[in-house]
Regions:
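Conserved ABC transporter NBD signature motif
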Residues: 68-76
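Conserved catalytic motifs of ABC-family nucleotide-binding domains
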Residues: 167
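The feature captures the beta-strand-to-loop junction immediately N-terminal to the Walker
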Residues: 45-47
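Helix-to-loop junction immediately C-terminal to a conserved catalytic motif
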Residues: 60
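Conserved ABC ATPase signature
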Residues: 146-150, 154
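Conserved ABC ATPase "signature" region
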Residues: 75-76, 123-142
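Catalytic Walker B motif of ABC-type/P-loop ATPase nucleotide-binding domains
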Residues: 171-174
């Protein structure tokens, strides 16, 4: 799999500029602004209804803001038509809490689904890439199984394989560990970190578990041992990671773990405690 361009190129994967959106007269996002540099990871937090998933839908062009500007991979999605957005989404991998696998298709067919939309790819190449993606999530043995034969955690891992098979420039995760037990959640987080540290793919992660993001900020995937390695105190992973916290539709924090640990904001201190 290929990696995204380095953030040192000065490129930005996502930019939100003063974005507002309301539903039925209820203002969900109020002047949201943030940037995700290429190759970096940003974790979004906030109480239920804070607008985290709405941000992902806006980035995909599934929703249009009432005002403001959203740029994704250099494209102004607020001005794009559906046909143009379809092409852009082909450069984005998505993993949601509900893995949404097709029960009538095998694991192999599910993972290959997005490749089927591309032209000029030989069956042998599709099979190779499917096995490569499943090997990455350590599920190559499930290639001929059906989703009904998999556990919830395994289904989520297949969803990750499907998201990365097209070598996306951007990954969007919407509560990828939601509904999973702690052990399985840790497995999913490890795979997300593996993708981050091996391929440096730009990622926007919505999570309800602060523990997941703290693990990501204080550990690094070690390719030689195929395990996570805790970083020495004061050392941080090679791939920059930041935290964005929402409250009442506004960004109240956007910074790294050092800044988060030293914040004076009482609401944030209580939220992360």
């Amino acid at each position: 799999m290929t990696s995204a361009p380095s953030s040192h190129d000065g490129q930005v994967a996502i930019v939100f500029e003063d974005v507002f959106i309301s539903f039925a007269g209820n203002e969900v996002l109020r002047g949201i602004s943030f940037r995700l540099p290429v190759g970096e990871t940003k974790a979004l937090f906030g109480v239920a209804g804070a607008g985290k998933s709405t941000i992902l839908k806006l980035a995909l062009g599934l929703l249009k803001p009432d005002s403001g500007r959203i740029t994704v991979l250099g494209n102004d999605v607020t001005e794009m038509k559906e046909g143009e957005l379809f092409g852009l989404r082909g450069q984005i991998g998505m993993v949601f809490q509900e893995s949404a696998l097709f029960d009538s298709l095998t694991v192999s067919e599910n993972v290959a689904f997005r490749l089927m939309e591309e032209h000029g790819i030989y069956d042998a190449d599709i099979d190779r890439r499917v096995r490569e993606a499943l090997r990455f999530v350590e599920l190559e043995h499930t290639v001929n199984m059906f989703p009904s034969e998999l556990s919830g955690g395994m289904r989520r891992r297949v969803a990750i394989a499907r998201a990365i098979i097209t070598h996306p420039e951007l990954l969007l995760y919407d509560s990828p560990t939601g509904g999973l037990d702690p052990v399985t959640s840790n497995t999913i987080v490890e795979l997300i970190m593996k993708q981050r540290d091996v391929y440096k793919t730009s990622s926007l992660l919505v999570s309800h578990r602060l523990q997941d993001a703290f693990t990501m900020a204080t550990h690094q995937f070690d390719q030689s041992s195929n395990t996570l390695r805790a970083l020495p105190r004061g050392q941080y992973c090679d791939v920059p990671m930041s935290f964005l916290i929402l409250r009442d539709g506004k960004v109240i924090f956007d910074g790294d773990i050092r800044e988060l640990a030293h914040t004076k904001d009482e609401y944030i201190r209580e939220y992360i405690s």
